[in-house]
From Swiss-Prot:
Site positions for Low pathogenicity: N66
Other information: Is not encoded in all strains, and seems to be dispensable for replication.
Keywords annotated in UniProt: Apoptosis, Host cytoplasm, Host membrane, Host mitochondrion, Host mitochondrion inner membrane, Host nucleus, Host-virus interaction, Inhibition of host innate immune response by virus, Inhibition of host MAVS by virus, Inhibition of host RLR pathway by virus, Membrane, Modulation of host cell apoptosis by virus, Viral immunoevasion
Protein name in UniProt: Protein PB1-F2
UniProt region (Disordered), positions on chain: 1-33
InterPro entries in the cross-refs: Flu_proapoptotic_PB1-F2 (IPR021045)
Pfam families according to UniProt: PB1-F2
Segments of skewed composition (Basic and acidic residues): 1-23
Known role: Plays an important role in promoting lung pathology in both primary viral infection and secondary bacterial infection. Promotes alteration of mitochondrial morphology, dissipation of mitochondrial membrane potential, and cell death. Alternatively, inhibits the production of interferon in the infected cell at the level of host mitochondrial antiviral signaling MAVS. Its level of expression differs greatly depending on which cell type is infected, in a manner that is independent of the levels of expression of other viral proteins. Monocytic cells are more affected than epithelial cells.
Amino acid sequence: MEREQDTPWTRSTEHTNIQKRENGQPTQKLGRPNLIQLMDHYLRIMNQVDMHKQTAFWKQWLSLKNPTQESLKTRVLKRWRLFNRQGWTS
């Protein structure tokens, strides 16, 4: 009988099914995650990503020394363009 690979995906699912082998000994096999588990996993990962982005963003701002209004405006526009991936029209 084939064993499932031990991956972060299979480790992240807590649901287990118990199957009987042909010789009668029970084995545990990770089941497929249901929709609620998938959404929970997705939201946890995205929350971690957002926290990392916010931390990196504020570290950049705090590292600026005596910023002028123009330099801040330029910086904000660059960030805006990167996040939206659209051409800037002035």
